[in-house]
Amino acid sequence: GCKGKYEECTRDSDCCDEKNRSGRKLRCLTQCDEGGCLKYRQCLFYGGLQ
């Protein structure tokens, strides 16, 4: 099956084909903050340009 939000992934196609209320689609992304980036990628709703 597909992977939902915050689930570990390797590519965009791993993520479920769903949108949030803002119309953002799930993409396989690396979460980063001031401390650096996670070692793995997760399915997250991406609001950037397609």
UniProtKB/Swiss-Prot annotation:
Gene Ontology annotations of biological process type: envenomation resulting in negative regulation of voltage-gated potassium channel activity in another organism
GO MF annotations, alphabetized: potassium channel inhibitor activity; toxin activity
GO annotations of cellular component type: extracellular region; nematocyst
Membrane spanning stretches: none
Localisation: Secreted; Nematocyst
Keywords carried by this UniProt record: Disulfide bond, Ion channel impairing toxin, Nematocyst, Neurotoxin, Potassium channel impairing toxin, Secreted, Toxin, Voltage-gated potassium channel impairing toxin
Primary localization: secreted
Family recorded in the similarity comment: Belongs to the sea anemone type 5 potassium channel toxin family.
Note: Negative results: has no activity on voltage-gated potassium channels rKv1.4/KCNA4, rKv1.5/KCNA5, rKv2.1/KCNB1, rKv3.1/KCNC1, rKv4.1/KCND1, rKv4.3/KCND3 channels, hERG/KCNH2, voltage-gated sodium channels rNav1.2/SCN2A, rNav1.4/SCN4A, and cockroach BgNav1.1.
Record's protein name: Kappa-actitoxin-Bcs4a
Organism in which the protein naturally occurs: Bunodosoma caissarum
Lineage: Eukaryota, Metazoa, Cnidaria, Anthozoa, Hexacorallia
